[in-house]
Structure formats: C-alpha cells, structure tokens
Curated annotation (Swiss-Prot):
It comes from the Bacteria. The gene is hutG. Its EC number is 3.5.3.8. It catalyses: N-formimidoyl-L-glutamate + H2O = formamide + L-glutamate. Mn(2+) 1 binds at H133, D159, D163, D253. The lineage of its organism: Bacteria, Bacillati, Bacillota, Bacilli, Lactobacillales. This is Formimidoylglutamase. It is an enzyme of class 3 (hydrolase). It comes from Streptococcus pyogenes serotype M1. Catalyzes the conversion of N-formimidoyl-L-glutamate to L-glutamate and formamide.
Length: 328
C-alpha cells in the first residue's frame, strides 16, 4: 500500500454532461483510478495519470509565501473546464493526492516517488500537480526508480531560479531539489544533465552561478536570452541538450512567468518568460517523444487573482498532453 496516498473521490467538474467527445470537457472524460488496486495491470497505448502533491513545507522552510498546498484542487478545477481533444484512444486518469500535513518533507517526497514508480509500472505517464518545487525531487526519484541504473534521465526546468542551493544546514526545501538530484548523480557516478529555462539574474546569487559554471552537464538560458532568441533558437538549444538522451523529465515552476501572467505564486516575478513562447517551447519538448513525465509547481491559490495562475498551469498541461499523445 502506498503511504500518504489518497485516491480521488470527488469530481472537480460541475457543468453539464455530454457523451459526445466532440463537445466533451476534461472533467467529463477523466476517470478516477486507485493506485492501490492490486488487480491493475499495465495499460496498453498512451495514457496519463494526474496526481496532486499537497505540500508547501519546502516553501515554508525556504521562507516563501505558503499556499501551494491548495494548488492541486485549483488546477484540477481549471483543467476540468477545458475541451477534450484527445478522442477515445487516450485516457487521463485522476489518481488522487499525496497528502500528509503531519509528515516530514522527506517522507512526503518518498511517498510521491513510490506513487510515480507505480504509475510507470502501469505504463501511465505521470503528471504531478504541486505543491512547492520540493515536488520535483520526489517526482524525479520515482522516475529514476522505474529505470535501470544505467538509463539516462535529463531534466529541463522552466524556472526563474536554479534551485541548486546547498542543504547541509537548512535541510531540503523548495530551493534544493536539483542540488539533491545533482548529488545523487555524483554518488552514482552519473552525469547530471540539467537545463534551466528562464533564469533571472536578480533571483540567483553568485554562488549559484559559480556552481553552475563549474558543473559539467548544467546549462541555462536567462529570461532575457529567451526574449532575444525567440522560440525557434530556444528549441534548437533544447535539441542540442537532448541529443543522445533517451528520456527527459520536465518541471514548470510558475514563478518563471511575470506577475501579470502568474500573480499567484510562492515568489512573485516582475520579469518573466512570455507564456505564448513557453507553450511553443513546451510543445517542442513534448514532440521529441522523450518526455516521460512532467509537473507544474508553485501555484499559490491564496495569492492568485481570479485563478489566473491556476488557469495558466492547466493550459500548459492541456498542450503538453495533446502533443505527448501524438508523439509517444
């Protein structure tokens, strides 16, 4: 039995029901699935599993604005309203949440990793609704556990921050997940392939830039780089990064986008990547056929305005799933 795991029992769609897939919405089509059901066998074809990670403990430890614990419900509500474009050959299952208000951050990350591995064993592509960016380490661990030790797993992070902070004194938090991945790779004598899109210089200290400069395998583009390059050159840079890689894990921190597009985040951003450009880049990553799982994190509903940020996060999920279904 999976720990800290609660299957979904309540629909987030409250509109009319229509059996016609040409007019259906996500909330009509998505089906509940209990990962603890021992009778389940691996699914055939391309299907997705949506799980919430109800934790912003890492944000609290990192002195950010808490509230991301409420994000899975907010994103589900927005996603449920979107039109269904996936026909009858692709299914998105809502498998519930990882939740444990009295559990430690490390315990919740471990529980998420086991749920992710369970999804992969069932041939379901994971979509995780954070949660703070501590979500990423649990998601990554689960993906790695589903692979053999020699298998590669590159990481693309759309984020204003490197999230490579040391954690020997503070302990793990929302800003340390990728340093934990890096340290795991060093311990296993693997190269950590990590590409950050949307870095803002005013959000990262010189220690982090120095660490990146000295670390083989880590690349980044600033938000200003992306603005100047345009999406086609950014996509070519991603292609070069993914050359020779068979798998990539994608994580989207909603503070990558300006406060005008994403006001409800743990750490607001005055600058930021254009969401329209981001959609084109995300679709390109999905079209590589290498994307094995993704998450959207750091949505903070108590700080959102008219669900702008939750809706944008749901929009990214809509387009990523659409392209992944075509290229898997």
């Amino acid at each position: 039995m999976l720990e800290d795991y609660y299957p979904s029992t309540t629909s987030y769609y409250h509109g009319g029901i229509d059996d016609d897939l040409y007019t259906a919405k996500w909330g009509m089509v998505m089906t509940f699935l209990d990962l603890n059901d021992s009778s389940l066998t691996p699914f055939e074809g391309t299907h997705f599993a949506l799980i919430g990670f109800k934790s912003d403990k890492g944000v609290y430890i990192n002195n950010g604005r808490v509230g991301a614990v409420e994000s899975p419900a907010a994103i589900r509500t927005q996603l449920a309203k979107f039109p269904w474009h996936l026909g009858n050959q692709v299914m998105v299952y809502d498998v519930g949440n990882i939740d444990g208000p009295n559990r430690s951050l490390e315990q919740l990350q471990n529980s998420l990793s086991k749920a992710i591995k369970r999804m992969c064993d069932l041939n379901l592509k994971p979509i995780v609704l954070g949660g703070g960016h501590e979500t990423a380490y649990g998601h990554y661990l689960g993906l790695r556990q589903s692979l053999s030790p020699s298998d590669d797993l590159a990481v693309i992070n759309m984020d204003a921050h490197f999230d490579l902070r040391p954690y020997d004194q503070t302990g793990p938090n929302s800003g340390t997940g990728f340093r934990q991945m890096f340290d795991d790779a060093v311990a296993d004598k693997r190269l950590f392939k990590y590409f950050v899109l949307g870095i803002q210089e005013h959000n990262n200290n010189l220690f982090l830039f120095d660490f990146v400069a000295k670390s083989k395998g880590i690349q980044f583009l600033t938000g200003q780089d992306i603005y100047q390059m345009g999406h086609q050159k950014v996509c070519r840079a991603i292609d070069r990064f993914l050359e020779g890689q068979e798998r990539v894990y994608l994580t989207i921190d909603m503070d990558c986008f300006s406060v005008g597009a994403a006001p409800g985040v743990s750490a607001i951003q005055s600058l930021g990547v254009d969401p329209n450009l981001a959609v084109l880049v995300l679709q390109h990553i999905a079209a590589s056929g290498k994307l094995v799982g993704f998450d959207v994190v750091e949505v903070s509903p108590p700080h959102d305005i008219d669900n702008h940020t939750a809706n944008l996060a749901a929009t990214f999920i809509f387009y990523l799933v659409q392209i992944m279904a075509q290229h898997s």
